């Protein structure tokens, strides 16, 4: 079963700069993917090709020098997020994807793997020195992925998703020999398939005539 905990980060000046570059790259790649899709798919009916865009990232890194400082898998994550946004749009559970703005409240980037804790610090790719973390709760399980975010207050947090290794408790099977059917009615409140009856509560008895009158009244309309 997957669970998630969020922790406060205390990056130094150099780490803040690199975190902000990762956040900017996530927004940059997402917007480029959306722009490429919009320009080649004006009628918005062609499925989004996430794999094709991911293949173009190495070439993009040659043209945009600072992208070389970013973890390669963190560069792929925005394309996958955009793909999920298009899937929700096709299922009509959300609107058409919009371009991301650096002025929006919460900014973040995704780290799919190679996430460790060492001596009170968070170790992730591209960060030579671990980031100081307030590890207020131990993680008992295998780390699956992490998301580092910057809040409007300027504070940084990391959300760690991990697998507890414990599956959800299955529901007990329904046995035919222990199952009965129940009918609800006006005369008798409840009648089981075995013939047992439960009388109506007093408040329902007192209002039975009103219920019948109302039923006849609206059945004529």
Task: Describe the predicted segments one by one.
Residues 1-221:
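Nucleic-acid substrate recognition interfaces
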